[in-house]
Amino acid sequence: MSVSRMIPRLVRASASPMAVPTAFRRSFGSSVVCAKDNDGPRGPSTPSTAPEYRQNQTSKPPNQFMPNSTSTMTNDYPKVGEKASPPELLNSVDPNYRPADPYSGKVQHFTGGRQEPGAQKPELGLGEMEGITFKVEPLQRSGEDTTTMRARLLYQSRKRGILESDLLLSTFADVYLAKMNHEQLQEYDRFLDENDWDIYYWATQDAPEEGTPAEDTPTETWQRTGAKSGEWRQTIGAFKAAYRPVPTRWADSEVLRLLREHVRDNSATGFHAAKNKKTGGSGLGRMPNIQVFDS
């Protein structure tokens, strides 16, 4: 190899970082010496009262379990001064306080049910509701022919606003509406002015036996699953609604009798009309197609 080639190679090798000795390399790392808890320029990292505070907190009984549905604005809730105490201070204010069961299957706890209710009527009339002082009067229609009334009642049966009433009344109207005379149509018109949940329970509930509790009761399904997961008792299927008696104005109603027969005929379990068939009731699985009434 000629001298002219060796000189450039030696120059490149000396300029390479690998050729720099290890002793001349500079490290850019940094390290900090951690002081002990009670050492250092800023003093101790934990306050001097920490052991005493820890001993004070561990000696107290645990705070009561407070579900997210328990209101702190009730009269029996412990107070700290003028305002209600936060949940973490309950064991200091009243160690023996136990919050009442917030639910028995109703939502009255959120809507003022803790307050003392006033005098209630034994039976609410048409257009009356619990907790209101006014009366919702239904619309009065005059000069309506039978065909128009059937079409309107079919619409009102299908558009109730809740799924249970939609399925119940739409299937009922599909079977019976075309067969009703003018007097039955007028009675059915007045019946649809009732509260949707009242109609649903009047048609689906049987008279209770003696000793049955007159309030909503949690189901076994909720006790196995929802009670452990913190699920509300208002969830669908979590409670069995209390029996709602039929008011005297509908006790002898032909429309209500037909509606209850319609429920029994379509029931999948437990009703006599379904047992008399070779196969059980088909249920109320879907809303039927719209009928067109010629007369």
Swiss-Prot record:
Residues 35-90, 208-227, 269-295 are annotated as: Disordered. SUPFAM superfamilies: YgfY-like. It is found in: Mitochondrion matrix. Keywords: Chaperone, Mitochondrion. GO terms for biological process: mitochondrial electron transport, succinate to ubiquinone; mitochondrial respiratory chain complex II assembly; protein-FAD linkage; tricarboxylic acid cycle. Pfam families: Sdh5 (PF03937). Gene3D superfamilies: Flavinator of succinate dehydrogenase. Residues 45-75 have a biased composition (Polar residues). One of its GO terms (cellular component) is mitochondrial matrix. It comes from the Eukaryota. Its main location: mitochondrion. Belongs to the SDHAF2 family. This protein may be expected to contain an N-terminal transit peptide but none has been predicted. Interacts with the flavoprotein subunit within the SDH catalytic dimer. Plays an essential role in the assembly of succinate dehydrogenase (SDH), an enzyme complex (also referred to as respiratory complex II) that is a component of both the tricarboxylic acid (TCA) cycle and the mitochondrial electron transport chain, and which couples the oxidation of succinate to fumarate with the reduction of ubiquinone (coenzyme Q) to ubiquinol. Required for flavinylation (covalent attachment of FAD) of the flavoprotein subunit of the SDH catalytic dimer. This is Succinate dehydrogenase assembly factor 2, mitochondrial. It comes from Aspergillus terreus (strain NIH 2624 / FGSC A1156).
